[in-house]
Amino acid sequence: MADEMTKIEIVTRQSKLEALKTALNEIGINGMTVYNVLGYGVQKGQKHKYRGVEYSVDLLPKVKIEMVVCTVPVDDVVNTAMSVLRTGEIGDGKIFISPVSKVIKVRTGETDREALL
């Protein structure tokens, strides 16, 4: 149901952020929080060379985008993100989806759906 509140967290390459923001805005997502984060998954970091010496970077720079939706269907957000982010390569990212039981807008005291609009 579209009126349920759902948190969607997307962790992906920094280079995909602008395209993702644009695509999400086109389907009605007009609020999100963005973090620069470090992490790794299957790729386990990368090997680099500097002045002939090889070294490993264990934590890779990523971007984490969070949003709580109640009017835009979760499947629309996921499908949009997948179409923008998927390259078929390791490092495309992850999408986490979880229910939200309560939202409170601090400025007005509005709660739940009204706090998100």
Where on the chain are the PLM-derived regions?
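Positively charged, small/polar-rich N-terminal and surface patches that mediate targeting and assembly
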Residues: 1-117
